[in-house]
Amino acid sequence: MKIFAIIDEETTLLTGILLYYEKEGTCVIELPEYLDEWTAPLLFTSYVKKKIYTIPRDISFLWVKERVIPSGRQNINDILAHHNMQSYDEMKFLEISEGKCSQDSLYIKKIDMLPDFVIERQKKNIVECVLSDDHTLLCFFEDDTIKKIQLEDLQSFEEQNKIINNEQVYQSGKVGTGGYCVTFNESIDLPAWLLYDEESNIPLNLNDFKVFLKKNVLDTTESCDLLECSRQNMSYMVRKQQLTPVKEEVRGNLYLKGDVLRTLW
């Protein structure tokens, strides 16, 4: 993951933090809570008005795209050759230009550490999510909070019915990049902060954990299928501590699905 500070050159104000997950080509922008509709980047003002400071990945990527040379530019091949690029890459162009464009005074600067406000906010990100019966989500968060949430109760989530009314879409649900959402069909993102804010700390029962084991613990073969890799690749990741088994067996290890997915980020 690469981390960039978004800074206003005129005021020197830290305007946001851009997280770029290179393996998936996914961007997430975190905004400081001191921003208002006048100091926030124009594209994000509607979110700031609603007190939403974690920008969805599609809107974050749109911010990147708006600041770089479009892929349809007539001389794009010459530009790619000039920068020794084999293919069009929005983030590469953003780094080359330092994120500067004519529409505002913002620029980006690569940093090594996440600011405290981002670290604190990420404690509400999702680690594991179990798709239980009756469209109920069992969500495990970074700060050890566990919530059991019925999709029908998320009235503020506009795309709720697209998930509820299509069982195939519902069953496709998984933890999204960085734990920022539960994503369905890779096209509908249910934000982690929205799930965390639900008043639903319902006591768990044994069946909840049985469902968890059934759906979220993978053996070596299932993990290889999910990552589309060989057993040798799996062994390499374990040796390099990129992946930690929850149980080691001679015939094959067991892994948490969330840990396996994180190797793709």
Where are the regions that the model predicts?
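Short helix-start
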Residues: 244-265
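DNA-contacting interfaces and partner/effector-binding or oligomerization modules
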Residues: 111-165
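Residue-level detection of the helix-turn-helix DNA-binding "recognition helix"
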Residues: 239-240
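A short, Lys/Arg-enriched interface patch at domain edges and termini
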Residues: 189-205, 258-265
